[in-house]
Structure formats: C-alpha cells, structure tokens
C-alpha cells in the first residue's frame, strides 16, 4: 500500500485555501462556500470536519461533513459530502480509508448516524453504509440515493 498521509483539517489549517480550491474544482460549488465551512470548523464553531488524503503535499482525496448536502430531507443530518479521489489514485482504498476516518471521528464527537447522498449503487456498502431512501436534490430533476451509516 502506498504511503499517503490522512489528516483532518485542524491538523493542517495551512491547507484551507488549497483544499477549498481543490473541492471547488471537483464539484463546482463556490470556493467561498468551502472556505466558510472550513473556517467555522477551524475556529471551533462546528465539529463538522474536513478530511484530506495527501501524496506529499498534493491533495489526492477528500471529503467533508455538513448539515445538509443540498437535498430536501433536512431532518437527515449531518451529511458526509464532497467525496472525491483523484482519478489516478482510485482503487487504492483512499476513499474507504477517509470514510472510515470520518465515521470514527464523528462518532467520537457524538454524531451518529451519518448520512450521504450519491448516485453510486454499490461503493458505499463496502464500508458499512446502507441504502436508506431516495431524496430530492435541490434544483435537481431526478431523485438521488440517500445512505446511512449507523
């Protein structure tokens, strides 16, 4: 297995700008939205964290936790969001490691269950997530899958 570094953002607050830019490039959500969430986390205003995988100093994977990942089921919170691994680094266990890290960290902070919206149909089950229901994404014509991690 490769020697990657897995961190939560409080360990490396210096990466906030680079991480916000990276997530913005992957998902198209304004960089400022990521900066706002990350800054609140770094200042201790929320325990909803941000998690990264680094190859040296290069961000190659990441995800965060927010109240609601742009869907109509506001009662299902918090949500793991922005799950992404760079294409050249896929199938190496990075996303799975990050998911397990997030679950462990959030459970230790008293957050259980966690939720996640995705169009994937088998990936998350490998890491203990279960399909819960279909939800309507904000401004989306199609319903999307909601998973739960108890």
Labelled PLM ranges:
Residues 52, 58-68, 79, 84:
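Conserved beta-strand in the GNAT
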Residues 27-54, 60:
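Active-site rim helix/loop that mediates acceptor-substrate recognition in acyltransferases
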């Amino acid at each position: 297995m490769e020697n990657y570094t897995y961190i939560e953002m409080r360990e490396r607050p210096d990466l906030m700008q680079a991480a916000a830019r990276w997530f913005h490039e992957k998902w198209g959500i304004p960089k400022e939205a990521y900066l706002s969430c990350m800054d609140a986390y770094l200042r201790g205003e929320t325990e909803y964290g941000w998690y990264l995988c680094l190859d040296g100093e290069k961000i190659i994977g990441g995800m965060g936790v927010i109240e609601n990942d742009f869907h109509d089921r506001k009662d299902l919170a918090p949500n793991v969001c922005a799950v992404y691994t760079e294409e050249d680094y896929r199938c190496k266990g990075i996303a799975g490691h990050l998911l397990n890290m997030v679950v462990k960290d959030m459970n230790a902070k008293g957050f259980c269950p966690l939720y996640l919206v995705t169009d994937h149909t088998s990936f998350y089950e490998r890491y203990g997530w279960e399909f819960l229901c279909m939800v309507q994404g904000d401004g989306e014509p199609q319903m999307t899958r909601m998973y739960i991690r108890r």
